[in-house]
């Protein structure tokens, strides 16, 4: 494989996700395999502006495939949104001999990469890393599978105490704009009800569902709630509302928060990261740019960055039906 590209930079940007380190490892080792150099860029786009670079080789990524977070760190950069900031970043890349970029992150990170690439005609490739699984052009993003396993493990433990005390637990999970975590983890954990941004269940229907569960003989219940659900109340306000209207329920709240982003990545995320990293580097070496590598129909595929940024993921309607049936 011949290419004008001799050195590739890799960075992580936006919210961290399990599997990012595995993706960094894959990018670095694929570069080494093709006998080109790789440079780690610390703290995302801010590190590009400040020239915070470090040469990376196969041994520098030993024993990170199992690590959560990102060894390259991540940071927001308002300066990168300015012409001056982008010019500084470009000048540093040129000074460092970097010919192309692999950006691991979400749609915000991809927006920055797309604009930068268009401004300076600089080759970029994106790898989707976010636990929310809300990026168009891939069935799975890095970290989603691990986050699901983390959430299910937490809910299983919550179920133990809920059953012991005949309580209703409202479990809030991440997902401001997308309910993929809530829906999949809710089904996997046997939740009695699931609230997501894509569906407006309504307070009346929620109360009816809880009353039905109680009448059917269920002594405890779990409601999984995406943080961006359309119910119109915070999870704590919802608790008060339920206790006011259904006083027979002893209701508790558990907000899982940032623990969903942490932890050792699952086998699926490690393999996914390895596959996407290889494809990202080899696509750049083939002369491709402004694409995101993702999974479509269980195959690694390229989606134009602009589509990944502007497209919208859809909830699997069949999962909604399965959830409804399983709550019987």
Identify the residue ranges that each predicted region occupies:
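Flexible, glycine/charged-enriched surface loops at secondary-structure junctions
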Residues: 36-42, 161-168, 219-222, 248-256, ...
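Short, ordered loop/turn segments at secondary-structure junctions
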Residues: 13-16, 41-47, 76-77, 106-108, ...
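A glycine- and small-aliphatic-rich helix-loop capping segment at beta-alpha/alpha-beta transitions
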Residues: 25-34, 54-60, 115-125, 142-146, ...
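C-terminal non-catalytic interaction/assembly regions of soluble proteins
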Residues: 240-328
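Glycine-rich oxoanion-binding loops at beta->alpha junctions
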Residues: 2, 48-103, 109, 142-149, ...
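Accessory alpha-helical/coil subdomains and C-terminal extensions
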Residues: 103-105, 111, 115, 120, ...
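N-terminal phosphate-binding or glycine-rich loops at protein starts, especially the Walker A/P-loop
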Residues: 2-49
């Amino acid at each position: 494989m011949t290419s004008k590209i001799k050195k590739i930079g890799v960075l992580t940007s936006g919210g961290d996700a399990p599997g990012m380190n595995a993706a960094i490892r894959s990018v670095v080792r694929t570069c080494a395999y093709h006998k080109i150099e790789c440079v780690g860029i610390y703290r995302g786009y801010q590190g590009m502006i400040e020239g915070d670079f470090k040469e990376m080789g196969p041994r520098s990524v030993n024993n990170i495939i199992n690590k959560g977070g990102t060894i390259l760190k991540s940071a927001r950069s308002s300066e990168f949104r300015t012409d001056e900031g982008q010019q500084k970043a470009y000048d540093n890349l040129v000074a460092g001999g970097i010919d192309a970029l692999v950006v691991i992150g979400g749609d915000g990170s991809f927006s920055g990469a797309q604009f930068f690439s268009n401004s300076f005609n600089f080759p970029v490739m994106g790898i989707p890393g976010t636990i929310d699984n809300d990026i168009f052009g891939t069935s799975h993003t890095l970290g989603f599978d691990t986050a699901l396993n983390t959430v299910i493990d937490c809910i299983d433990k919550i179920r133990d105490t809920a059953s012991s005390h005949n309580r209703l637990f409202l479990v809030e999970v991440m997902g401001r704009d997308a309910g993929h975590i809530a829906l999949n983890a809710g089904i996997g954990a046997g939740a009695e009800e699931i609230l997501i941004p894509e569906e407006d269940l309504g307070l009346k229907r929620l109360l009816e569902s809880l009353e039905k569960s109680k009448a059917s003989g269920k002594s405890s219940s779990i409601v999984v709630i995406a943080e961006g659900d359309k119910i119109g109340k915070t999870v704590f306000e919802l608790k008060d509302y339920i206790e006011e209207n259904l006083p027979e329920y002893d209701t508790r709240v558990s907000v899982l928060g940032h623990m969903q982003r942490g932890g050792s990545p699952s086998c699926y995320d490690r393999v996914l990261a390895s596959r996407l990293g290889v494809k990202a580097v080899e696509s750049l070496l083939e002369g491709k740019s402004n694409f995101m590598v993702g999974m479509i129909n269980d195959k690694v595929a390229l989606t134009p960055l602009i589509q990944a940024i502007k497209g919208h993921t859809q909830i699997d309607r069949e999962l909604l039906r399965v959830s409804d049936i399983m709550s019987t």
